Each structure stands twice: as C-alpha cells, then as structure tokens.
Amino acid sequence: MSTSTFNRRWAGVILEALSRHGVRHLCIAPGSRSTPLTLAAAQHPAFTPHTHFDERGLGHLALGLAKASGEPVAVIVTSGTAVANLYPAVIEAGLTGEKLVVITADRPPELIDCGANQAIRQHSIFGSHPAATLDLPRPTPSIPAAWLISAIDETMGALAAGALHINTPFAEPLYGELDETDLTWQQAPGEWWQTTTPWLRYEKIQAVSAQADWPFWREQRGVVLAGRLTAQEGEAVAQWAARLGWPLIGDVLSQTGQPLPCADLWLAHPRAAALLAQAPVVVQFGGSLTGKRVLQWQSECRPQEYWVVDPLPGRLDPAHHRGRRIVADISAWLEQHPAHPMMPWDEPLEGLAAQTQRIVARELTEWGEAQVAHRLPELLPPDGQLFLGNSLTVRLVDALAQLPAGYPVYGNRGASGIDGLVSTAAGVQRATGKPTLAVLGDLSTLYDLNALALLRDAPAPFVLIVVNNNGGQIFSMLPTPAREREKFYCMPQNVCFAPAAAMFSLNYDAPESLAALKEAVTRAWRSSVATVIELRVPETAGAQVFSRLLKAVCA
C-alpha cells in the first residue's frame, strides 16, 4: 500500500471517529501537508465544509459555528505558521467554552529542527490553552485502527469545554490515486463502520445536587447577576429572579431582557450600592461581565453568600469572593432550586433604573454612536440574532440599550480581543441560518477585513454596521496621557469602507442620521447580498456623551 493511500485512510479514520462525537462542521484552509485530511473530509457525507484562505479568520469562523450551534467544530490546517494563526481562536475557546477540534497537519519528526521547509515545532504549540492535546504518531499499519479510534474517543469523551489540539504528521508522498487493493487495516474495526456511535463510549453522569440550605436563602433578599448566557438560559434566569422578587442586573450578553436597564450607569449613583447591600446573598450566572460599574460593584459587594453558577470550570470571579462555585448546567440548576414566590424588594432600584433610562432617552437626541447604541433594539431583525464587537461598541450597548429577553446575542468576551470578529459573526450565522446584525468598530473591522469574503456566502441577510469613530476611541474613556493618546492609543486610520465592500461585491451604505440608518437596515433585510453600513461619527463624541450621562445620573 502506498504512503499517500495510507495517509488518506489514517485521516479518514480520524474524521470518522470525530463524526461520532457530533462534529458536523469542518473549517478547512488550503495547504499541501493537510491533503490527506482535506481529501478525506471532502468525501465524507456527514460534514458541512467551510473554507477560508486566512487561518486566523478560519479559526474564528469555527469559533462562531461552535458558539451558535453548541456543537464541536473541527478546523484543518497545514503545517507551519498556519498553525500559529489559530492561537487567538484557541485562547477564546478556552475562556468561553466552545469546543474547537484543531487538527494540524505536521511534517514527520525527521524533518523538524533540521532546516526543512515549513517545519516548525508544533508539539504543544498552544501551551496551556487547549483543554486537551493529542499528538499522533506518523501513520503506519503497525498501529491498529482501534488504537487511533479509541485515542480520539478518549479525548473527545473527556472534552467538557474548550479546544482539543490534534497534531498529526504525514510523510510524503501526499498525492496519488487511492489504492483499493489492501483494506485490511481499514476494515479491522468491523461493524463499527456500519454504526454511528463511538468505538469507546464515555459515560458522563452530571447530576445536579441541590444546595441543602436553598429553602432558607430563597426566603431572603437576594441579587441576581447575569453574565454571558444562552437565550434559553437568559429567559429562565429572568423568570426565576422575577418569581423570587430579586433584582436582576443583566449583562449585554445575558439575554435576560435586562429588567433593570442601563445598569452600568445607575450603579454609579451613590444610592445604588447601599440598596444592593441589603441583600445577604448574590447569585451570579455566567461570566464575562462587560460594564465597568457592574464590575466595580461585583468587586466591592460583600454579601454573606456569593454563588457563581456556570457549566464551565474555574473561578469566574475576579473579585475572589468567599462563597460557592457551582459547576453545573444552568437550566438543570434552576430546576433543582425552584423559586419561592416573594414580593419584590427592589422598588427603589426599579425607580433608579427608570430614572436613568429617561435621562438616556432625553440626552441622546443627536446623531452618533451613543444614540445608535441606545436605539439598537429598533434595528434587530425579527427571528434574527445580534453579534457585538468589543471595545467601545459593546460597552455602549451594554450601558444604553435594553435588548429583548431571549433574543440571541453573541460576542467574543473571553479574551475580549478585536481580532477575528467579522469571521466569528460569519460563523454564528452559518450555524443558524438566521438574519444577522453585527456591530463592530472601525479598527475591529480593519483587523479582520479579509473576512468580508466570508460574507459573500451568507445564508440569510447579513448587516455589518461599522461604527467608524476613526480609531480606538475606548482609550478616550481611559486616563491615557492626552499628549500621546491619539498617536499611541487611538491610532486613527482615516479610512472609508466603501472600497472594501466593493472589493468583495457587498452592498454598501453610509447613512448620516438615525432615520437614514433605519431605512438602510430595512433595505438590507430584503437583500440576498450582505450589506456593510458605515457610520462615520465624531471621533470622541461617544466617550464624551457617556461621561456626560454618568454625571447626569449621579447628579
């Protein structure tokens, strides 16, 4: 049997084993060393292939697919720096829990550290960021297929969240006709090929046990803090908190409907902390909190009990409260801890939030990114989804908008980087097929500009709003040195995105008022071609308006 044929069979077994663990989407970059994997993937009926020429964007595309589907997603790349380009996506998956299966083709061992072309040290290249790493040997018939299958089953069976890095070397030749004369190695697993289940099945028993003293605590005053949740979890948490009569502080990614809107503003009011301090227990669901004032309150509050409930491992509490870290499925935990109907105790907080919302509506009458953030719910497509970028964009929406409960909202708030955001949004849409609104800043869009190529194949209307405030204006909200701020922090690029949209044959619009923006978005929802909408806004106006609102709320 030729080397190229056995490489293909080895790769085919890897992918077949992964398909038994729910992998449906494969993201593939061009490359020669990965040929056995690519050809095996192309011929496998269980996979939906996605391609992209930029491995960094490809990793984020896979991240978005995993984020929205809730399934493991595989990535195939060739050897060399192609592997290193996946690093940001691997880091984000490790922090937010998406299951990424990163399959990296490698040179065989004798070509490492000897000057061979495109050969780097890929062993443990991602350091501690993957949840698991599997370094496979050079394909050889002397290693039974059952070993290879069970190695995949073991790592996938134990993978609760995060990335799995599978490094697999392939020797040349990589090309050639598939030799069908000797199938002994491939056929050794027997009837496994006719089934759809793993060779080695790992049983996970994840029963959620109730907190023994919950009947006591549910009778007390409490506060619910909601971070990043799914739409289903967000609605359930909101209903649970309302039934308990506990105030709910919801992050922009909580999908709870934020019943106390504009929390990142009203928490700056002197009365807020004192009112919340009346609660002896705080229950936090999910991590990745966005708002500065929310994080400050979370850090400074000192309840008798602080509980963090999330399926991901780790503390998820940068303030290091004394309390309980409950690793559990949130929906299952809520079922085990039913709410006892209580009268709300947070009327003063409701009044504070309502007053803040009135101030926001009164102040935000002029065109700009703050007004767009406040009125963003009016732009959402029915039965669609929202993807928010990082930096100033997500903070303004978090503080100024009240998003509908249960409306899907996505973002990369693990490492909160501005890389790969267009790619991630494209992956989110490919997983769901829903109309998608993405809102990013100009630097974030520039950072991932070639990912506009991914929007050419959008399965539903896609609107990318680029808030062009000419640089990283988040630094205008920070105490950066005034003299160095523009050159070394904000870094204005003075660009227009119309040529970029034209390059990738996308629609383009540049409205200059809220009414014109609504008209542009309405047109875009009727188009089968993705639309880039550029909002050219005053550079520092967003930061200045936010500062003014904080002062007005605290007055």
From Swiss-Prot:
<protein>
    <recommendedName>
        <fullName>2-succinyl-5-enolpyruvyl-6-hydroxy-3-cyclohexene-1-carboxylate synthase</fullName>
        <ecNumber>2.2.1.9</ecNumber>
    </recommendedName>
</protein>
<dbReference type="Pfam" id="PF02776">
    <property type="entry name" value="TPP_enzyme_N"/>
</dbReference>
<keyword id="KW-0479">Metal-binding</keyword>
<comment type="function">
    <text>Catalyzes the thiamine diphosphate-dependent decarboxylation of 2-oxoglutarate and the subsequent addition of the resulting succinic semialdehyde-thiamine pyrophosphate anion to isochorismate to yield 2-succinyl-5-enolpyruvyl-6-hydroxy-3-cyclohexene-1-carboxylate (SEPHCHC).</text>
</comment>
<comment type="pathway">
    <text>Quinol/quinone metabolism; 1,4-dihydroxy-2-naphthoate biosynthesis; 1,4-dihydroxy-2-naphthoate from chorismate: step 2/7.</text>
</comment>
<dbReference type="GO" id="GO:0070204">
    <property type="term" value="F:2-succinyl-5-enolpyruvyl-6-hydroxy-3-cyclohexene-1-carboxylic-acid synthase activity"/>
</dbReference>
<dbReference type="InterPro" id="IPR011766">
    <property type="entry name" value="TPP_enzyme_TPP-bd"/>
</dbReference>
<comment type="similarity">
    <text>Belongs to the TPP enzyme family. MenD subfamily.</text>
</comment>
<comment type="pathway">
    <text>Quinol/quinone metabolism; menaquinone biosynthesis.</text>
</comment>
<dbReference type="InterPro" id="IPR012001">
    <property type="entry name" value="Thiamin_PyroP_enz_TPP-bd_dom"/>
</dbReference>
<keyword id="KW-0474">Menaquinone biosynthesis</keyword>
<keyword id="KW-0786">Thiamine pyrophosphate</keyword>
<dbReference type="GO" id="GO:0000287">
    <property type="term" value="F:magnesium ion binding"/>
</dbReference>
<dbReference type="Pfam" id="PF16582">
    <property type="entry name" value="TPP_enzyme_M_2"/>
</dbReference>
<dbReference type="GO" id="GO:0030976">
    <property type="term" value="F:thiamine pyrophosphate binding"/>
</dbReference>
<keyword id="KW-0460">Magnesium</keyword>
<keyword id="KW-0808">Transferase</keyword>
<dbReference type="InterPro" id="IPR029061">
    <property type="entry name" value="THDP-binding"/>
</dbReference>
<dbReference type="InterPro" id="IPR029035">
    <property type="entry name" value="DHS-like_NAD/FAD-binding_dom"/>
</dbReference>
<keyword id="KW-0464">Manganese</keyword>
<dbReference type="InterPro" id="IPR004433">
    <property type="entry name" value="MenaQ_synth_MenD"/>
</dbReference>
<comment type="subunit">
    <text>Homodimer.</text>
</comment>
<dbReference type="GO" id="GO:0030145">
    <property type="term" value="F:manganese ion binding"/>
</dbReference>
<dbReference type="Pfam" id="PF02775">
    <property type="entry name" value="TPP_enzyme_C"/>
</dbReference>
<dbReference type="InterPro" id="IPR032264">
    <property type="entry name" value="MenD_middle"/>
</dbReference>
<dbReference type="GO" id="GO:0009234">
    <property type="term" value="P:menaquinone biosynthetic process"/>
</dbReference>
